[in-house]
């Protein structure tokens, strides 16, 4: 029998919008945030309260960002998180929040979390710092707007990438099934990858779009963002998933699903 993960029940029928933290508002993050805005509206059309998203990013919009990331000339010099959230709120009529800083930080206590954490960063340290923070609350079994339940991580090189969603909680309650093997736990990215063996390279900011495209090709970020958000959408809409991620290779046009 195939393994399956049933979505945490709280997310399917919450009393208020499901809280989401998006960490990083660059190439992938800007695409993910826009997809989440559409997802929230679709969920509301189905009778769900939708999403409340908080975006974290301390960086400002540069000339090299325009074209590959979802920013315009009029936003040069502005904070990325503030620019994106302001645009989303005006377009969709939301009241989402922007935080022009990193997460976690000293300004946030252990109970200042969200139901779903989405990381769209390009460095290892931020993932390890976040995991250290989340491990402090992973044994909690309460369900409210601040209870962290899932962590979805996006990562990519120039033309390859992956998205993986895992459970922050050690176990998510699963119903019995005669067709599948319910899996209460899915590994998060830091449980899949031994980052201690990976040497992180500091590439520095790009000075132009052409230089930025040498590091990350034009459509790798948006491709990953759409696939990852589709996985999340189906977890809401269908209440289950047979897959916890995917590997993408734009050179070969191949996509490999990661089963639960």
Task: List where the protein language model places each region.
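Extended hydrophobic secondary-structure segments that form protein cores and membrane-embedded regions
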Residues: 20-23, 51-60, 100, 116-119, ...
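Active-site catalytic pocket residues across diverse enzymes, especially alpha/beta-hydrolases
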Residues: 36-44, 70, 134-138
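Short helix-terminating capping/connector loops at secondary-structure junctions
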Residues: 44-51, 142-147
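Localized chelating/binding microdomains
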Residues: 1-5, 10-16, 78-82, 88, ...
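A structured beta-alpha segment of the ubiquitous adenosine-cofactor-binding alpha/beta core
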Residues: 76-114, 121-128
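Glycine-rich phosphate-binding loop and adjoining beta1-alpha1-beta2 segment
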Residues: 49-93
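Glycine-rich phosphate/adenylate-binding loop
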Residues: 2-28, 32, 123-260
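Glycine-rich adenosine-cofactor-binding loop
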Residues: 18-46, 54-62
């Amino acid at each position: 029998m195939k393994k399956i993960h049933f979505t945490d029940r709280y997310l399917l029928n919450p009393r208020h919008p499901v809280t989401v933290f998006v960490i990083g508002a660059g190439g992938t993050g800007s695409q993910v945030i826009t997809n989440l805005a559409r997802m929230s509206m679709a969920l509301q059309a189905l009778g769900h309260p939708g999403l409340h998203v908080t975006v974290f990013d301390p960086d400002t919009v540069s000339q090299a960002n325009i074209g590959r990331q979802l920013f315009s000339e009029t936003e040069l010099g502005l904070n990325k998180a503030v620019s994106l959230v302001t645009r989303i709120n005006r377009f969709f009529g939301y009241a989402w929040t922007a935080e022009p800083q990193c997460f976690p930080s000293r300004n946030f206590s252990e109970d200042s979390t969200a139901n779903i954490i989405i990381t769209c960063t390009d460095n290892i340290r931020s993932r390890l710092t976040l995991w250290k923070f989340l491990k402090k609350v992973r044994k909690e079994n309460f369900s409210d707007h601040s209870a962290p339940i899932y962590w979805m991580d996006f990562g990519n090189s120039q033309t390859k990438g992956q998205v993986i969603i895992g459970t922050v909680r050690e176990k998510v309650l699963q119903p019995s099934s005669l067709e599948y093997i319910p899996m209460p736990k899915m590994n998060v990215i830091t449980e899949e990858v031994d980052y201690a063996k990976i040497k992180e390279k500091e590439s520095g900011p790009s000075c132009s779009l052409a230089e930025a495209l040498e590091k990350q090709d034009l459509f790798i970020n948006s491709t990953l963002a759409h696939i990852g958000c589709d996985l999340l959408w189906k977890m809401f809409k269908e209440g289950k998933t047979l897959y916890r991620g995917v590997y993408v290779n734009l050179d070969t046009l191949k996509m490999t699903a990661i089963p639960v």
